[in-house]
Amino acid sequence: MSAQDFLVELGSEELPPKALKSLATAFLAGIEKGLAAAGLEYRVARFYAAPRRLAVLVEHLVAQQPDRTLNLDGPPVAAAFDAEGNPTQAALGFARKCGVELHEIDSSGAKLRYSRHIPGQPASALLPAIVQASLDELPIPKRMRWGTRKEEFVRPSQWLVMLFGNQVVDCEILAQKAGRESMGHRFHHPDAVRISQPSSYLEDLRSAYVLADFAERRELIAGRVADLAAQQQGSAVVPEDLLDEVTALVEWPVPLVCSFEERFLTVPQEALISTMQDNQKYFCLLDANGKLLPCFITVANIESRDPAQIVAGNEKVVRPRLTDAEFFFNQDKRQPLESFNQRLASVVFQAQLGSVLEKAERVSRLAGFIAERIGGDPQHAIRAGLLSKADLASEMVGEFPELQGIAGYHYALNAGEPEDIARALDEQYMPRGAGAQLPSTLTGAAVAMADKLDTLVGIFGIGMPPTGSKDPYALRRAALGILRILIEKQLDLNLEEASHFAVAQYGTKVKASGLAEQVSEFVFDRLRARYEDEGIDVSSYLAVRALQPASAYDLDLRVQAVQAFRRLPEAEALAAVNKRVSNLLGKYEGKLPAAIEARYFDNASEFSLYSALQQAQHAVRPLAAERRYREALERLASLRDPVDAYFEAVLVNAEDPAIRANRHAMLAQLRGLFLCVADISVLGQ
């Protein structure tokens, strides 16, 4: 079957840069979906995207849709005709549904069947509808109309290229008649560009100063920015989302180095970086020590004969932004950080939970409680908690909200606070996202956990837990943040105890009954989802959770040990044995003897298991006490043979009550050893 390349390019006014990549990938996905539904095979498809165009190139697309046979089954033949052979209403209704006469329907099988041969259509006849459907399904939150047209799109359409092979596909989409003329660079090549065939698309546009390949432009910008940064003896700060956005802003990228006055370097560099990245889309440069250099890189969309003019223009534009940041910083420094707390008394944290100042006071007390239990400095944590929200009332954070915590760090140092306290003001918001950096100090860890736990307790306490996909207070993220800090920093904290303390700080603002348990259960449940993401069996988590450990760090050590135990050859049999033992003990009526007495043994396997249990007990309990859970389970795995022999030779529910009690006591000791780590019986369910 013959095949040719297919190209579609929709030209428009400048597309939203932050959405360009997602629009392009969705456009490609929609076309691939349409081709698959139509049965049109192809070799490969890829998207291209630039500020004024979305394009898809499909290589080696078949020219003809394959023929199909449509089979429709109707009612059973017995129900389709009466005893005299006359058609029933069921048969007549099926014929009407198929749009044919009854004699055209096959009645030779168990059911009536109508088969129709559907010849395939030319690909060129199907492509317009496929493209239109893909455009209709693009993730555009708000479409617009332009002029007097009824068509809607994210931006007004300007032209349409649609080629199958070297032939134009005859159609009209978004009020644009398909042709082979695209447009070049707005300034370097403002004239139309003739696309001779799909395979020449990139080169035809390149000759018109347009790099249509998003990935190529992105790589070019990243490489050139890195080279220019090296020439300045620095390295560029290149966030992925900023690189994508800049790539979406230019068709012919030309990176240039600009500079600003060194006096601005007295301002916290995070503020300067923030304004240059967010407002101007510049790439900032750092020296070998991570300090901001007084220069930046802008990416022009034009190859100027006088690049110095572009450099001067960008330097002129950025200066007022940096001056504003400098002004806010100097204004804020005129007063002690703690004085900002007065303004927080009138700022609402949550209508039912009081002001931000009240939250800071609660966080302060809770942070001191936590710090004492994780080996930190309670007084530092109390002080850091009290100052934790002060910078929210500053001019700097008012202008740059993303600097909350960072501004507090600098203002705390300026006010003479210890480094440990100042750093905690920044670290309270850590981790700022999945996999993000954790607090480096115990004071920071204490304040970060206190802040998150206070929010969890408060929102749960007024009956507003997350429901389904709705989590307006980011409580799931807060819970995961607490867990990451505890587990990855190996901090031992009784979460339920901390939750009870947090509940007490709210007084009558929350419904306290059962609240601490509800919050700690919610936090631990986030671990289940985390383990699933990491490929750890849910049953490993449930086996440990059955013991209700209060420390997330301890729970994680146990889960990792159980997961390793599962890979041992003895694991499956011992899990089944634990399940059996659990059932036997659950059905036993009466009090178990305090000690196992060998005088009741009447079988060699009893002596063997008893001896193995005594040896295991001396080895396992010290290992468990030292939290060497993996070694403990490896040692318990050696019990498989004596346990198997015991159950083969011994009737646990003996008729003699004393013997029966003694045997159950030995099983209780066996189970108790495993419960030093986890309820292994869960693995056998």
UniProtKB/Swiss-Prot annotation:
Matching Pfam families: DALR_1, tRNA_synt_2f
Keywords per UniProt: Aminoacyl-tRNA synthetase, ATP-binding, Cytoplasm, Ligase, Nucleotide-binding, Protein biosynthesis
Subcellular compartments: Cytoplasm
EC annotation from Swiss-Prot or TrEMBL: 6.1.1.14
Main location: cytoplasm
GO MF annotation list: arginine-tRNA ligase activity; ATP binding; glycine-tRNA ligase activity
Assembly behavior: Tetramer of two alpha and two beta subunits.
GO CC terms, sorted: cytosol
Catalytic activity: tRNA(Gly) + glycine + ATP = glycyl-tRNA(Gly) + AMP + diphosphate
Matches recorded under HAMAP family: Gly_tRNA_synth_beta
Record-given protein name: Glycine--tRNA ligase beta subunit
Sequence similarity: Belongs to the class-II aminoacyl-tRNA synthetase family.
The keyword ATP-binding is annotated on this UniProt entry: yes
SUPFAM superfamilies linked to this entry: HD-domain/PDEase-like
Keyword Zinc: no
InterPro entries: DALR_anticod-bd, Gly-tRNA-synth_bsu, Gly-tRNA-synth_heterodimer
GO BP annotations listed: arginyl-tRNA aminoacylation; glycyl-tRNA aminoacylation
Species this chain originates from: Azotobacter vinelandii (strain DJ / ATCC BAA-1303)
